[in-house]
From Swiss-Prot:
Protein's UniProt keywords contain Cell division: no
SMART domains listed in its UniProt record: AAA
E.C. number(s) listed in UniProt: 3.4.24.-
Protein's name according to its UniProt entry: ATP-dependent zinc metalloprotease FtsH 2
Amino acid sequence: MRSLWIVLVLVLGSALLLQVMAASDDRIPYARFRSLAERGELAEIEIRDDMYIGRAVSGLSARAPQSYRTGRIEQTEKDLLADLDRRGIPYTRVADELGLPPYLWLLLPLAGLAAMGHLASRRATTAGTISGAATAFGKHKARLYEERGAIATFRDVAGNAEAKTELSEIVDFLKAPERYEKLGGRMPRGVLLVGPPGTGKTLLARAIAGEASVPFFSASGSEFVEMFVGVGAARVRDLFSQAREKGACLVFIDELDAVGKVRGLGGSVGGHDEREQTLNQLLTEMDGFDAHTAMVVIGATNRAEILDPALLRPGRFDRRVHIDRPDLAERKEILAVHARKVALDPGADLDAVAAQTAGLVGADLANIVNEAALLAARRGAEAVGHGDLEAAIERGLAGLERRGRRLGAREKLVVAYHEVGHALTASLLPTQDPVRKVSIVPRGPGALGYTIQQPREDRYLWSRQEILDRLVVLLGGRVAEEEAVGDLSTGAQDDLLNATELARRMVRELGMGQGLGLSALEPRRPLSFLGEAQGAMPSGAGPRECSDATARAIDAEVARILADAEARARALIQGHRPTLERVAARLYEVETLSGDELREMVASGEA
């Protein structure tokens, strides 16, 4: 190969040298060029950008050059052209396409051949490493934690008492697998943690490994699937191969639904083949556990309904543990765990914070404590006070306070009436949660005011009357605007959307409508053509499971429920109009009212 390149360079170099020598033979001084023209030895002349080229008259001499070149002199060109005209020698002007010497054109093919040779040699030198690069691409991306200090324990997991009890068997198995082998028992090879986002599924999995003092492999389902078919399966094989080398260990796959969705519906589109191959390999690896394999696979998802049934059969993820939202006692424990990391003022009441955060998950509570610490640091405090915690709660519920957004006097008054309409109807209906705060300070991207209600206790069931009263509260703001100002605004848009959705669910899903019987008319969430369950849709937005006549009856019943709620809200507002005016005026003045102030003003109006 090298000798071939040497010969090629010599040949091209010789051709280049001959071209240069040939070009230099016909170049003559300008005076001689003029003399040849005067003697009539030039048949025609080309005028180039930087030279004259004269073609010799044929037949003068066999040894004479066929053409002559000389440098162009623009100062004497006028005389030269006049002389050529007198002698009848034709001339033409020719523009150079590229200002390159002729010999450089020989270098262009040489450069091209050199580039091709370089690429060929580079490909030859790297051919031996391609297989190594492909192997590296198929390596898993899971993080390995082996030091006990890097892994959590059950003490770091507040709440979830039932889940920890359920998973303690896994810890015992990882610590002493021989005890189960002696009895002929087999622990579940896979455990599926199911729960809403932020409930602590990942932390709980790490705590299992920490309690058992075993290596912990942590990966996300999306890390297995790539655009190249076969890469995900290779990564699964590599992960389980390394896990087996560790002996007793725990493999955690977060967001399992990214790789474990239902297979086979609708054919293959895009990366569907790659995901299915990855899932098939995962199923194969879990089938390969023998009785002496002290390895447990834990998966976590918040979308268990879209997982492939093969993942959930016995021998794979056959134990399912639900991680639910924390109740009041668990929220207290979670807040106490996170509060240990900040300087907390003795006056901060974590019990009150737990009571105000019903429905929030552990990640939300951790964020509240962190936001409170940031707010305390911003005001230069030495400890996090209760006010900082409440401000952090409101920031999470309603958004960032925007005192820089100034409302006009009329808009501010309309917002005040609107929020007092919500607060007043909620205070007058005994089934509704008490109001904790009313404000007309803008928050978030679009909220011009807000009313916060604090649940008396954790709730899991709601009666029909409670839902109907909730509709009254939702429509109370709009009714108060209309009664007090005499007009309607766009501020009730979200209230109308929420009220319509709630009324439609009463009729379609809960059997709480009149004249429609007990049929549940809301279809289950359908699977898309890829096998993925469609996301949450408003009630009635999916395919209908009823006739056109029933659909019209549903719409009529929803309209009736909303009309009744509006009439009840109007009766409450009209019956307590002085209280509405007094509370709205006070809110307009101070911009924020606490729940105690509101209840005191409502009670004084009742007296």
